[in-house]
A protein has these predicted regions:
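Hydrophobic pocket-lining residues that define ligand/cofactor binding sites across diverse proteins
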Residues: 85, 102, 119
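Terminal substrate-recognition subdomain of acyl/acetyltransferases
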Residues: 116, 120-170
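Conserved GNAT acetyl-CoA-binding A-motif
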Residues: 99-114
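A short acidic/small-residue loop/turn micro-motif
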Residues: 61-63
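Short amphipathic alpha-helix that is part of the acyltransferase structural core
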Residues: 1-31, 38-54, 75, 149-170
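Conserved acetyl-CoA binding element of GNAT-fold acetyltransferases
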Residues: 69-83
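Conserved acetyl-CoA pyrophosphate-binding loop and the N-cap/start of the following alpha-helix
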Residues: 85, 89-97, 107
Length: 170
């Protein structure tokens, strides 16, 4: 049975290795390390199976160009599952859990730059349809979900991820 919990310092090496294996390069692993070091890992959860870290999800703060000062938004990135455990529902469990953590912790919305066949099943819709743009010129695969009903009516403009994303050219 999968257990999902907040990351702990003893998980950091496994999370680093997991991201390298899942993405095939060290960029996302470096991003996680940099976000954590800058205290920008707002939500960072791990999936544990038989005592082993098999999945990880991280949410970091975002800003929206034209939004109320009180807006608390998150960017979902990265989310990874060890290759040998993919397509078993672990990623879906991490996303559902992470969104619920965001709601419980008072966040307003989450954006993701991700797979069109994966994220809509959780309620993500095309961000452009809500007047939101991104720094990466992504269109259809840049998506958003409200964690508080009606919040998207008050926001438009450019969504900016944490500076660490630009520093690593993710």
């Amino acid at each position: 049975m999968i257990e999902i919990r907040d990351e702990a310092p003893q998980d950091f090496p496994a999370i680093r290795n997991l991201n390298v294996l899942a993405f095939g390069n060290p960029a996302e692993a470096l991003l996680v390390d940099k976000l954590r070091a800058a205290n920008k890992a707002a939500i960072s959860r791990v999936a544990i199976l038989d005592g082993r870290v098999v999945g990880h999800i991280l949410f970091s703060p975002i800003t929206v160009e034209r939004a109320p000062a009180r807006l608390h938004g998150l960017g979902l990135a990265p989310m990874s599952v060890l290759p040998e455990f993919q397509n078993r529902g672990i990623g879906s469990s991490l996303v559902r859990d992470g969104l619920e953590m965001g709601r419980q912790r008072g966040y307003d919305l989450v954006v993701v730059l991700g797979h069109l066949r994966f994220y809509p099943r959780f309620g993500f819709t095309r961000a452009k349809d809500h007047g939101l743009d991104n720094e990466y010129d992504a269109l259809d695969n840049f998506m958003v979900i409200e964690l508080k009903e009606g919040v998207l009516k008050a926001v438009t403009g450019l969504v900016k991820y944490a500076q660490e994303f630009q520093d690593l050219a993710i």
